[in-house]
Amino acid sequence: MFYDICHLPLPQLIFCFSKIMLHFFSRYKFLGIVLLVLSSIIITIIYQIINPKEVLPVFQPAGVNTELVDSTIQHIKKYHTIADFSLINQNGKTITQENYKDKIYVADLFFTTCQTICPIMTDNMVVIQEKLKNDSEVMLLSHSVTPVIDSVAQLKKYALEKGVNDAKWNLVTGDKKQIYTLARKSYLAVKEDGNGDEYDMIHTENFILVDKKKRIRGFYDGTKEEDIVQLLKDIQILKKEN
C-alpha cells in the first residue's frame, strides 16, 4: 500500500497525506490539548525557578540583633507588628495607625536640634519624599525623641525649613515614654533601654520599612546614600507583593 501511495501523482499524494494528517489530529485532539497545557505549566515552572520572585524578609524580634530588641520580646519569632500609637504632627493633628492604614511607610527617629546625623537623615527622607511624591501608596513618619523640645510649633518650623510635604510625611511628637516604647519594642531601632526620663536620649540612624500589615520588612542606614537607593528598590518590591 505504501508503495502504491508513493507512486501516485503529486496532487493525489498531497491529497492523501492531508487526509492522513487530518485523521491523526482529529483522533488525538484531546492528547494534543493536554500536551499543550502540560508544556505551558512546565515552561512556567522552569521560568520561576530561573527567575525567582523577589520577596523581602519579615523581621521578627528573635531574628534581630539583641542590642536592638527589648529583653521582654527577644523570644518572639512571629506575628511581630508595630503597636498602635497616638501622637501629634507638625500641624497639631492627632496621628494614629489609621492614618497609615493600607500604606507602606518609612519610619525613623530624630530631633530638630540634632546637629550630627539628623540633618543627613532628614535630607535623605526628603530624597525619598521627592522620588515618591506621586505615589500615594507610600508615606513617611518621623518620631521626635525629644518631645519636650519638639513642640508642634517647633516641628512646623522644621518642616517648613526642610520642605516637608504634609500629605506624605508626618513629624510627630507626644508622650516621651510612648515614643521610646515604640522605638524599642516596635521598631527595634535602638541599642539602649530607655524609659523616657528627662535626659534619656534614644536615637539611631535607622530607617525602618513597614508594610501594609504593620510588619517590619527592612532596616537601612539613613545616613548612607547606597542604603537609600536600596530602600527605594525594596519599596517597589514590596508594592508588587501587596
Predicted regions and their residues:
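N-terminal targeting signals for export/organelle localization
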Residues: 3-82, 242
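Short active-site neighborhood of thiol/selenol oxidoreductases, capturing the structured segment around
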Residues: 97-125, 141
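Hydrophobic beta-strand positions
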Residues: 86-87, 209
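Short, small/polar residue-rich loop motifs at catalytic or cofactor-binding pockets
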Residues: 80-82, 103-104, 202-204
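Buried hydrophobic packing residues in well-ordered domains
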Residues: 92, 107, 111-114, 125, ...
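Soluble periplasmic/extracytoplasmic beta-strand elements of cell-envelope proteins
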Residues: 108, 140-144, 206-208
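Thiol-/selenol-based redox modules, centered on thioredoxin-like
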Residues: 195-242
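Structural microenvironment flanking redox-active thiols in thiol-disulfide oxidoreductases
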Residues: 122-182
